Amino acid sequence: MISVYSISLGCPKNRVDTEHLLGSLGVAVQPVEHLSRADVVLINTCGFILPAVEESVRTIVETIDDLSGLRKRPLLAVAGCLVGRYGAKELASELPEVDVWLPNQDITAWPAMLAHALKLEGAVTPGRLLSTGPSYAWLKISDGCRHNCSFCTIPSIRGGHRSTPADVLEREARDLVAQGVRELVLVAQDVTAWGEDIGAPHGLATLLERLLPVPGLARLRLMYLYPAGLTRELLGFMRDAGAPLVPYFDVPLQHAHPDILSRMGRPFARDPRRVVERVRDFFPDAALRTSLIVGFPGETDEHYAALTSFVEETRFTHMGVFAYRAEEGTPAAEMPEQVEDRVKEWRRDALMEVQAEISEELLAVHEGTRQQVLVDAPHEEWPGLHTGRTWFQAPEIDGITYVSGPGVEPGALVEADIVETRTYDLVALA
C-alpha cells in the first residue's frame, strides 16, 4: 500500500484524470490529509488561463517549501494542463525539485510513469479511486477539442477531440454505480461531439443508449453541451428517453451578439436565441445554465447592452460570467480594440447582478413544492444538517439545497419540502 496526498486544480475533467491515475497503480492507495504522511504528493494542475497557471505554479512552489522541512521527503509528481501548456522540459528547468512530470500527450501512460518512479512491482491495471463521495461522480467521455475558438488554449494543451469508446464508458459507469454512486455527470470539452471520431451511428445518443439502462443509476446529467451539437434529433432522443436523464442543459454560449461570436471563432453559435428556443421546444421546464465572456476584444457598449438584454429575456436558471483575459498564443490576444480591465470587471459584476435577481425569482417558484434531493454530504458546522441537490442543481457549480430530516444521509435520494429559497440555494425538510 502507498499513501497519497493529492491536489487536483481546475475543472472536473482534471479530477477524473487524478482519480484514474490513483486507481490504476496496481497497488492499494490510501489517501492522506497531510503531505507529511504521504509516500507521494500528486499535483494535477490547470493551465487554461493565466490565473490558473499562476495558481498551479504557486501551489507547486508552496508544496516544495512544505516538503523541504520533512525528515522523510515524499516523491513529488506534477501532472495536468500546466505541463501540457509549457512542457516538462521547460518546467523542470525552473522547478527541479519536482521528481516526476506527467505530460498531457498520453494521459493513459501516467500510471506506468508514476509506478516506475515509485518502484512499484505490481502490474498497472485500469481503475479509479473516487474522491467525490457516494452521491455523484464525473464521467469523462472524451478528451481534447475539435473547435478553434480564438480565445481558448485547450486544443493546444489537450489536443484534438478523442472519444472514449462506449463499451469502456459503460463498464466504468456500471463500476461507479456498483460503488454506490447515484448520479453520473458527463463531462468533456464538448459532450455533444462524442462519437464523431469513432463512427458512432447516432453520435451522443449511441452512448446514452448504453448508459441510461445501468441498474441503480438515479440521475444522468450532461454538461458542456455545445450549441451546434444540440440538434433536434438529439433533443428528441433525450425527451423520449426520460429518466434517469435530467432535463438540465449546460450550454456555453459565451456571448449573444453575432459580431462578437464571429470574432470568437464561434460562427456555429451565432444565433443563441434559436438554440434556447430549440431546447425549450422539447423541454419547456428545462433548467438552463450558460457561461458568458464579457470584455472580449472589440466588445462595445452596444454589444454589451445586447448581451444584457439577451440575459434578461432568456432567464437562465444558472449562469457564470467571466471577464476576458488575453491568453498567450491565442488569436484573440493579438486582436485590436482590447477592452480595459476596469471595464471588463464592471461588465462582469453588473451582469452577475442581473443574473442574481433572475436566479432568486426562479428559485422562489419552488418554495412550497416537494422535490427529490440527492444528499451529498453532512454540513461541516451544523449537526443534523446536510447539503444536497435537486435535479436542477449540478454539483460544485450551482447552488445547493440544505436538507434535514429522517433518512437524510450521503447518497440518499429523499423527498423533501422546499421551505425557503435564497438567491442561489434552497432549504428543505425531508
From Swiss-Prot:
Q: Say what the protein does.
A: Catalyzes the methylthiolation of an aspartic acid residue of ribosomal protein uS12.
Record bears the keyword Calcium? no
One GO molecular function term of this record is:
metal ion binding
Q: Which residues form the TRAM domain?
A: 364-430
Q: Which residues form the MTTase N-terminal domain?
A: 2-119
Main localization category: cytoplasm
Which sites bind [4Fe-4S] cluster 1? 11, 46, 81
EC number(s) reported in the record: 2.8.4.4
Q: Which reaction does it catalyse?
A: L-aspartate(89)-[ribosomal protein uS12]-hydrogen + (sulfur carrier)-SH + AH2 + 2 S-adenosyl-L-methionine = 3-methylsulfanyl-L-aspartate(89)-[ribosomal protein uS12]-hydrogen + (sulfur carrier)-H + 5'-deoxyadenosine + L-methionine + A + S-adenosyl-L-homocysteine + 2 H(+)
- Identify the gene encoding this protein: rimO
Q: Which metal ions or organic cofactors does this protein require, according to UniProt?
A: [4Fe-4S] cluster
Q: What is the lineage of its organism?
A: Bacteria, Pseudomonadati, Thermodesulfobacteriota, Desulfovibrionia, Desulfovibrionales
Task: Please give the InterPro entries that the UniProt record associates with this protein.
Answer: Elp3/MiaA/NifB-like_rSAM (IPR006638), Methylthiotransferase (IPR005839), Methylthiotransferase_CS (IPR020612), Methylthiotransferase_N (IPR013848), Methylthiotransferase_N_sf (IPR038135), NA-bd_OB-fold (IPR012340), Ribosomal_uS12_MeSTrfase_RimO (IPR005840), rSAM (IPR007197)
Give the matching SMART domains: Elp3
Set out the biological process GO terms recorded for this chain's protein.
tRNA modification
Q: Which UniProt keywords apply?
A: 4Fe-4S, Cytoplasm, Iron, Iron-sulfur, Metal-binding, S-adenosyl-L-methionine, Transferase
Q: Which residues bind [4Fe-4S] cluster 2?
A: 145, 149, 152
Similarity comment: family membership:
Belongs to the methylthiotransferase family. RimO subfamily.
Q: Under what name is this protein listed?
A: Ribosomal protein uS12 methylthiotransferase RimO
Residue span(s) of domain Radical SAM core: 131-361
One Gene Ontology term, aspect cellular component: cytosol
Q: Specify whether Nucleus is a keyword of the entry.
A: no
Q: How is the cofactor bound?
A: Binds 2 [4Fe-4S] clusters. One cluster is coordinated with 3 cysteines and an exchangeable S-adenosyl-L-methionine.
